[in-house]
Amino acid sequence: MLEKQRSTAETFGIPLAVLLEITHRCPLQCPYCSNPVELDRSGKELTTDEWKKVLSELAEIGVLQVHFSGGEPTARKDLVELVKHASDVGLYTNLITSAVLLTRERLSELADAGLCHVQISFQGVEEGLADRVAGYRNAHRKKLEVAKWTRELDLPLTVNAVMHRQNLHQLPDIIQMSIDLDADRLEVANVQYYGWALKNRAALMPTVAQLDECTRLVEEARERLKGRLSIDYVVPDYYALRPKKCMGGWGRQFFNISPAGKVLPCHAAESITGLDFESVRSNHSIAWIWQNSEAFNRYRGTGWMKEPCKSCEFREIDFGGCRCQAFALTGDAANTDPACALSPLHETIFKQAEREAEGETNRFLYRNFAGGTLEPENDA
């Protein structure tokens, strides 16, 4: 069955790397959480055997890398078993983690099982601010400890720093922290404002001046640290003239699998109402879902586009921008992403971002299974 699907799936090219969100459970309460607004409960999660079947199928259809993510992937007791199975079927494995639940013993077990790489998220460099953003006491201290263990176990390390108005001033120190931790790579990822982050946009949106300085610092550090630290940079696009080529275009270069087994064109895709996403629990193979499912084909390519995207010279470069952002801001995922200057809403969101960035709102609506908790006023 899988062999029959291999050739058809290659029409769009099975991605070399796939994101596996094995759980939405997470001890952190980050206000910019990229998981769907409606989280999958633990009772809906794929079982160990189901995830093993997924891993075997991914390897068979040509996937080379899997990224174990969440939520917090270490919340699953079977993570070592899953990593070992992935390694056994020839997959490169990366753990994307907050690190706060890890012990040195368990990290060592993961390394012995074949884990190839660790990516740890950091909310800042100063413990008070970092723990406040995470909504979790002593998180920053634990992250530093786990980063040290990672290098002691000779595992490559990526530092993921999610940036916003309240921590952008720490970027020079974050770059230095990455060097001090002997990280191979730093991902400077500005918050993307959909899903839960949209609820906290007024507390997170940077000013234009902050973003310009952030870009300057990244460019300077890339040149200065060439060959020592690789730096990836993800910018927010509210202030841009052209939208980002989100995920390389819908259904073209990326898919992820949710805790409940849904195969998604991006981790925020379930925010678009009216789309039904196929599950690995269905009778269809993953390759069939990638190639033939209605959800993946809805916004794939350019045939779905309305004006001004339809006749735009950049339509096969940025593919109209982010479908999730278009839906969040306009109510129609087929509309031009308002980050684009050609969108009739572009000026509106630009001005709104400026107002929010200059505002005095700093309190977070924390992310949790209770539906969100507003940060106490005296803590903001």
From Swiss-Prot:
Give the protein name, as stated in the record.
PqqA peptide cyclase
Q: Which cofactor does it need?
A: [4Fe-4S] cluster
Instruction: Name the gene that codes for it.
Output: pqqE
Q: In which pathway does it act?
A: Cofactor biosynthesis; pyrroloquinoline quinone biosynthesis
Give the range the annotation lists for the signal sequence: none
* Lineage, highest ranks first: Bacteria, Pseudomonadati, Pseudomonadota, Alphaproteobacteria, Hyphomicrobiales
Name the species this protein comes from: Bradyrhizobium diazoefficiens (strain JCM 10833 / BCRC 13528 / IAM 13628 / NBRC 14792 / USDA 110)
Q: Name one GO molecular function term.
A: oxidoreductase activity
Which reactions does this protein catalyse?
Answer: [PQQ precursor protein] + S-adenosyl-L-methionine = E-Y cross-linked-[PQQ precursor protein] + 5'-deoxyadenosine + L-methionine + H(+)
Q: What are the Radical SAM core domain coordinates in residue numbering? A: 12-228
Return the Pfam families for the record.
Answer: Fer4_12 (PF13353), Radical_SAM (PF04055), SPASM (PF13186)
Give the E.C. number(s).
Answer: 1.21.98.4
- Could you say which protein family the record assigns here? Belongs to the radical SAM superfamily. PqqE family.
